[in-house]
Amino acid sequence: MRVELQVGFWAGAFLLLVLLLWLFSGVLLPFVAAVVLGYLLDPVVERLERFGMNRLGATLVIMASFALLLTLLSILLVPVLWRQLSSFVEALPGYAVQLQGLISGEIERLSREYSGGLIEKLGLGKDAGAEFASATNDLVAQAAHWAGSFLNSVLTRGAALINLISLLVVTPVVTFYMLLDWDRMVATIDGLVPMRHRETVRELAREIHTAMAGFLRGQSLVCLFLGAWYGIGLSLVGLNFGLLIGIMAGILSFIPYVGSLTALILSATVAIVEDWPRWHLLTLSLAVVLAGQFLEGNILSPKLVGESVGLHPVWLLFALLAFGSLFGFTGLITAVPLAAAAGVVLRFAIARYRESELYTGETSPDPKLLLKTARKEDR
């Protein structure tokens, strides 16, 4: 009964935590960003401490260096990115119209060339090409309208401005205190763990730390590289909004599959609209994106991230959808590290289950009976 009460208590505590996170999901992003930054920068602070600096001084040095780096990036990149984003939002309706015209023209051309041949063999009517073109145009128009509305709301809505301000103001403050009190917080949490299970929990925490640290630090470097690769590469080949597309794809590369799809779809769309019917710009843009994907899949991720996550792609997709539906964009960002932590706990639970009486079917001997037997043997 005691075990059942413990299981019920921890299950209830977990459900309560999930409920609270879901209720406050709208304000979690700056705090999650601060925790991630604190987690990534804490080893640097500890290294400075080993050189003789105290915790406060090391934290101030790290935060000042980080603020200087962000300031330089803001001066160099933010004005350019803002101009490109504003221009992209303005050009998006025109791009949609041009893309509709290109798709309609190509479908009509193909339907004329293959009329009486392939279309009739497939059992389609004479107007199948026009109907397909109309449906495709409607889909493109709807997607362009949705994307334009979303980007316009990002630029104009007060909520987006508040979120941006909270990221710029709240995140550095919380990160500073996280770095300053990191060891104290870890010690406090460790002291709250029941003594009977402390070593087990510590072992689990070490495995979770290995999985999460490997992913967060490795994937952050991958995102930095891909953002620079896409942004510089697409700009050099002459793609309009190349820097914006590259930086956006680099940031979204923290979410598996999303960054690569963003780079591929946006670069191909802009290249087709700007350069059709020539293939020169499209070929160069796709070469940049595919080369980045090759480097990520065969060199960067194996070297920097490795097998630290240990999740099957199906479970990875499930984690993205589940956390994204519960916590929005914050859930998408945290889905992989949290799923990695859940995987460690699940593997531990399976291992304990295989050692249990329920799995083996063997009843463990009564300790009192063992003690009596040992005493008889001693006599």
Residue ranges and their predicted role:
Residues 53-54, 194-199, 308-314:
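Juxtamembrane helix-boundary/capping and inter-helix hinge elements in multi-pass membrane proteins
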Residues 29, 33, 73-77, 104, ...:
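Alpha-helical transmembrane segments and their lipid-water interface positions
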Residues 27, 39-40, 75-76, 89-90, ...:
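Hydrophobic alpha-helical transmembrane segments of integral membrane proteins
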Residues 56-69, 108-128, 211-224, 274-277, ...:
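Juxtamembrane/interfacial segments around transmembrane helices
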Residues 4-6, 57-60, 146-270, 279-281:
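Alpha-helical transmembrane segments and their immediate interhelical loop/hinge regions
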Residues 1-83, 87, 159, 170-171, ...:
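Anchoring transmembrane alpha helix of integral membrane proteins
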Residues 23, 208-366:
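Alpha-helical transmembrane segments and their immediate boundary loops
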Residues 8, 44-51, 57, 64, ...:
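Juxtamembrane membrane-interface segments in integral membrane proteins
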